[in-house]
């Protein structure tokens, strides 16, 4: 008689999901693919199917309206073996509150320098948002941080129970391939969201011999286009289109000072493109003093030095980052959400007799 293996289910709750294009969505999407490959069922609880409004300062993000009842119903119906709350938005908040009320164990993550991001747009004091984060993540069994620097920052601020969850890069999709450089002058490129918190002016104000390219969209695009007529703006490009841009350029410039990681850094390096950035959270951990690029408080100096980095060594360094390894570390931090010692089968807060169409 053939035994049937019952797959375990992981529920990931996130306010950030497609059609958004950002590092959080790419991280969760890639992690989902890896977890499925490793034999798990993964249920993504996202804004899809909820009534939403646009986030005031980030319209691409859809904020779910009054989601608590539906979130509770979905958790009961899916009855996941593991619950991970990826974001602190309305869906994450609803899932957190349901879990704490029903003694359900869960993990959380820290993807964005939330206090600094909010402060840059609204001037809300950092102390207010840090207090919120302490409250939000306190009941989590582990708060997953992308780098050691972020881990240390969270520990210093006494936020949650930090644990490391690194990132990876698709080394097949992002690869050097054949480089067909059309421009004899150096090309300095930025790829990512075009918004105030990305600090793009520090890059675009530089006097560099060569061209400056910006690939991406966002609320600051129109303003930057009108201010910098010497910069080539390409707008949003798909994931399939990005490798060609990385291969064509000579230096990837990353002026942000608020990112926790910066997946685009790995994408660029995987294509053999050296990075120039400030020595801040994100680049410090991803690039550091490696062959992948140059960090300097003077971004122009970083750009000039990065030009001399051998592309083969840049690629070799990127090959040390693996999504398989990152996803296995993610798994190692998960805790069973249904603990028999906490409640019996008849009072399991997950169980619900109401049927509901589910999407995996």
Predicted region positions:
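Short alpha-helical donor nucleotide-sugar binding micro-motif in glycosyltransferases
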Residues: 75, 137, 237, 244-249, ...
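Acidic anion/phosphate-binding donor-loop and adjacent secondary structure
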Residues: 169-186, 222
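Aromatic "clamp/platform" in nucleotide-sugar-dependent glycosyltransferases that forms part
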Residues: 257
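Donor nucleotide-sugar binding/catalytic pocket of nucleotide-sugar-dependent glycosyltransferases
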Residues: 131-177
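A charged, aromatic-enriched C-terminal amphipathic alpha-helix characteristic of glycosyltransferases
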Residues: 308-354
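Nucleotide-activated donor-binding/catalytic signature segment of Leloir-type glycosyltransferases, i.e.
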Residues: 222-240
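Short hydrophobic beta-strand element within catalytic cores of glycosyltransferases
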Residues: 274-277
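Conserved donor-binding/catalytic core segment of Leloir-type glycosyltransferases
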Residues: 180-213
């Amino acid at each position: 008689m053939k035994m049937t293996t019952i797959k375990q289910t992981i529920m990931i709750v996130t306010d950030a999901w497609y059609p958004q294009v950002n590092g959080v969505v790419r991280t969760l999407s890639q992690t989902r693919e890896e977890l499925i490959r490793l034999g798990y069922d993964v249920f993504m609880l996202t804004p899809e199917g909820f009534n939403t409004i646009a986030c005031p300062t980030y319209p691409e993000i859809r904020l779910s309206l009054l989601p608590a009842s539906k979130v509770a119903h979905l958790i009961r119906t899916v009855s996941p073996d593991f619950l991970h709350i990826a974001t602190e938005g309305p869906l994450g908040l609803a899932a957190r509150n349901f879990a704490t009320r029903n003694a359900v164990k869960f993990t959380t993550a820290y993807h964005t320098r939330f206090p600094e991001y909010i402060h840059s747009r609204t001037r809300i004091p950092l102390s207010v948002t840090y207090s919120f984060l302490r409250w939000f993540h306190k009941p989590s069994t582990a708060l997953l941080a992308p780098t050691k620097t972020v881990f240390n920052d969270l520990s210093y601020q006494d936020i949650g129970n930090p644990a490391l969850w690194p990132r990876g890069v698709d080394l097949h999709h992002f690869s050097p391939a054949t480089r067909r450089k059309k421009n004899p002058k150096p090309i300095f490129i930025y790829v990512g969201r075009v918004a105030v918190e990305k600090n793009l002016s520090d890059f675009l104000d530089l006097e560099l011999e060569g061209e400056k390219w910006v690939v991406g969209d966002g609320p600051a695009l129109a303003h930057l286009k009108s201010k910098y007529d010497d910069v080539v703006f390409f707008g949003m490009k798909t994931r399939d289109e990005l490798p060609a841009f990385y291969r064509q350029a000579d230096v990837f410039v990353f002026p942000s000072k608020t990112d926790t990681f910066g997946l685009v850094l790995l994408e660029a390096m995987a294509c053999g493109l050296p990075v120039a950035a400030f020595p801040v959270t994100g680049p410090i951990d991803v690039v550091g003093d490696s062959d992948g690029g140059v960090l300097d408080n003077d971004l122009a100096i970083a750009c000039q030095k990065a030009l001399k980095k051998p592309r083969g060594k840049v690629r070799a360094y990127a090959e040390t980052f693996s999504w398989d390894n990152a996803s296995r570390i993610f798994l190692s931090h998960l805790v069973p959400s249904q603990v028999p010692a906490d409640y019996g089968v008849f009072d399991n807060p997950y169980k619900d007799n109401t049927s509901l169409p589910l999407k995996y």
